[in-house]
Each structure stands twice: as C-alpha cells, then as structure tokens.
Amino acid sequence: MKLQHIKKQLLTVALTTVAMGAMAQSLNSAYYTEDYKFRHDLNPAYGNDQNYISIPALGNVSVNTHGNFGYQDVVMNNPMYGVENGAKKMTTFMNPYISTSDALDGFSTGNNRITGDVNIALLSAGFKGFGGYNTIEVNAKTSFGIALPYELFEFAKNTGNNSYDIGDIRAHAMSYGELALGHSRQINKKLRLGAKLKFLFGIARADVEMNDVKADLTANDKWLISAKAKANMSMKGFCYKQETKEYNDPSKGEYEYVNDVDVDGAGLSGFGMAIDLGGEYKINDSWTVNASVLDLGFMHWSNNMQAANRQDTFVFDGFTDMDVKQGNGNEVFDDKADKYGDQLADFANLTDEGDQGSRTNRHRCHHQRGCKLQASMLQENDLRLPELYTHQGCLLMDRRQTECQLGSSEMA
C-alpha cells in the first residue's frame, strides 16, 4: 500500500469536486430582478405582472453549486516558482514548501461540502387567477453532493507516524422528475405569501460511503488502515456485475468482486413529495425583507442495491526477515506479497450484497433570507431639469453556502 498513491487519489477527488463549483452559474443574482420570470423558484411568494409560458426544455436551464471550500483552497501559488529551476507556477496544498497552517486554512474543521443542482424546465407557465399568481412546472432535475472531513486533508498534508481518525466520506447523486404547482397572493399592503407543492418521481439515486476511516501509522513495524466502504443504488432494473477470481493463497479458494453494472429496462423507481414556502414583507418604502424554505420533503425508493467491502482493515507490516526461496526458516517474499494481495482484494473491492429492500431519503432542503433597500435622490443637471435617481441594493443569504451576496443596480 503506497501512501503516495492514496494521496493522489484524494487529490483527484478534491480537484474534481471543486471543478464542478468553478463551472457553475448561480441564479441568486436574479433574486431581485423584477423581469425574471422564474423568481418563484427562489421564493414561491414572488409573482409576475404578466402571464408567461416557457419553451419546452429551453425556457429555463440552471446549474447551481454551493460549498464551503473551492479551487483556490486545493491549488495554490508555488512558493518555489522563480526560485527553483523547473518549478511550476501553481501547486497543490500538499506541497512541502507550503506551511501546514496556510495549506489547511481554507478548509472547514468540520465537513467540507460541495452540493449542486441541475434543473431543466420541460414546461413552465405562470398566470394570474384564484386571487393571486399561479405557476405550473414540469422539471427534470439532478442533484449531487460530496462531504470530505477536515482530517482527510490533514492526512494528505501531514502523512507521518501519527494516528488519523479521518471519519466519514460521503458522496451522492440523484436524478428525478418534478411536477410543481405554486400559488402566491398579496395578504395585505405589506405582506405577500406563497407556497408550492411538488410531486417527485425518482429515476435513480446513488450513495457511496466510506465510514469510520482511520489510519494508524504510529508503529514503526506496522501500518493499519481501516474503513467500511458501501455503495447503495436505487434504480429500476439496476444490478451489479461481478467477476470471480482466485485468491493468491489456494487454500482460500475464490472471491467475487464488482467490476461493472447493468441496467435492464428503465422506469421510475421512487416517489416523493416536497413543499416550498416563502414570504415577502414590506417594512416601509425603503426596506423589504423576505425568506423562503425550499424542497422540504422526502423521496421513497422501491429498491436498494447494495455492495460493500468484505474486510474493513488492511495491515501492512513490511517485508522484514524475508527469504527469496524456501529453506531458511523465514517467510518467503512471494508468499508475503500474495498475503498482502489477498488482504487488499477483500479491503478494496466491493461485493454485491443484493437488494436490501425499499428506503426513504430526506429531500435536501435549504432556506434563503434577503432584504432590499431602496433610496431616492433628487438631482439637478446643467439645464436645471430635475432628475430622479433610484438606487436599489439587496442582500441575500443562502443557508446552503453560508455566504452573503451583495448586488446593486442604478436606474435613471
């Protein structure tokens, strides 16, 4: 087991994750854009002055990602650039010339998360009626997320003779269809409320977990790495494909491991429901506050195809006191290598454990809060004709990413 190989795999996961965030477009900038017809997706209390209908699959396509770490936390300026011949301008946080405090400063001491959503509006329409504004939507959606503990990055940066309790590593992805019915109305001059009922039709959900990951490197003569790996897949007609191999030790017989997947047919595998709730309150002519809770609900899946590793520990105690051939009373090098190979086969490979039955997942929920400030100023120009300038600023907080966005626009 080569630690450098492990570190490269961890870096690949981190770079792939943050790259998804770098390519994303955020819809939050449209939160206070009055002419944006799909603001009700951010807060169901919002309506429109006009009726509308979108072009199927082209009316609204959105990609959103949220996270508490980014590309700049993984890839950094190389302190040896221009100092050492051949040094590249950029390097990773694992570079030995970058201090541990600087390398790990951008990562949360809890879980480091990136989540994302892709939404394609197959049909969307809005119209006035029933005392308010109504929306009907048919959407194709995909969501994904990954959670990496701080200790994982600490292990990658400071691999040495220490004990590391890394914790749980989790990733998931889900694809589903959505039928959403929304209604909003003005309660009084100051308050507007809205709600949206969503029917969810599950296509597929995948969850990959490595639980209780630990690395004990304190002993000079033995390294121990442990983790319980598990993959769960809910999808109609899905199954794991396995291959049979023989252990290096003939006395252990054969083992099976997952090397491919197969989908026989297609269709819906899950059903769920969710609601959006939102409100907007006008304090006075200058201040307006609003809040929304989105995707509060669940998804129930009819199957759960599971695969897991057979052995949750890998022990490496070196190649000391080895003989090349039998006869000197010591363990033979080839036999020791075969033992490690068999141990790794059980630790690193997944085995099909069949359908575990139905399961229910909580739908990922988030909420947003915002406020809008509008101020007017009377100004005279050279012709002494009055001009009214309106400055509007907004502050939006999205609880999925714990960051504030400040935007403003000027209209003459």
Label every PLM stretch briefly.
Residues 2, 120, 386-387:
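Conserved short hydrophobic patches within well-ordered secondary structure
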Residues 2-11:
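Bacterial N-terminal signal peptides that target proteins for export
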Residues 6, 22-142:
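N-terminal, post-signal peptide beta-strand-biased segments of exported outer-membrane/organellar beta-barrel
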Residues 15:
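N-terminal cofactor/phosphate-binding cores enriched in small/glycine residues
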Residues 58-89, 138-152, 205-214, 298-310, ...:
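Short, solvent-exposed beta-strand-terminating loops
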Residues 118-146, 172-198:
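Hydrophobic alpha-helical hairpins/lids featuring a short glycine-rich hinge
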Residues 153-412:
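Outer-membrane beta-barrel porins/channels
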